[in-house]
Amino acid sequence: MLATTDMLSRLSDVRGRIATCRRAVDDDAGASVVTAAVVREFDTKADKAMATADDARRDAIIELEQAADSARVAAKADPDLGSTALDAVEDAHLAICILKTEV
């Protein structure tokens, strides 16, 4: 299990990947409104996880992983989503999955 400072540092890195993911989807003209909405929710959950008290952060990370799963499914199902946006969603999803195994 990660120490609190390590967990926050790792979560901050994941937060950056999620922000990149959101920008990529927002910038993709082919992204559906559904994909964009699900990715925005993923981004919102990341903000929530960063602001969560230390003793509740593990639960927030689990909730964030669930949002990542939803974003990944939406992105993979979006036929007009570009490869850059899809890759960014996959990267953010993988990052939170790895973090979850460490907490």
What are these regions (language model features)?
Residues 1, 5, 33, 58, ...:
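Function-determining surface determinants
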Residues 1-39:
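Short terminal alpha-helical segments
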Residues 8-12, 33-41, 58-65, 83-90:
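Short, charged, amphipathic alpha-helical segments
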Residues 17-18, 46, 97-101:
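Extended alpha-helical protein-protein interaction scaffolds
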Residues 23-34, 51-57, 76-83:
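Charged, low-complexity interaction regions
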Residues 38-43, 48-77:
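Long, amphipathic, charge-rich alpha-helical segments that form helical bundles/coiled-coils
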Residues 70-103:
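Amphipathic alpha-helical binding modules
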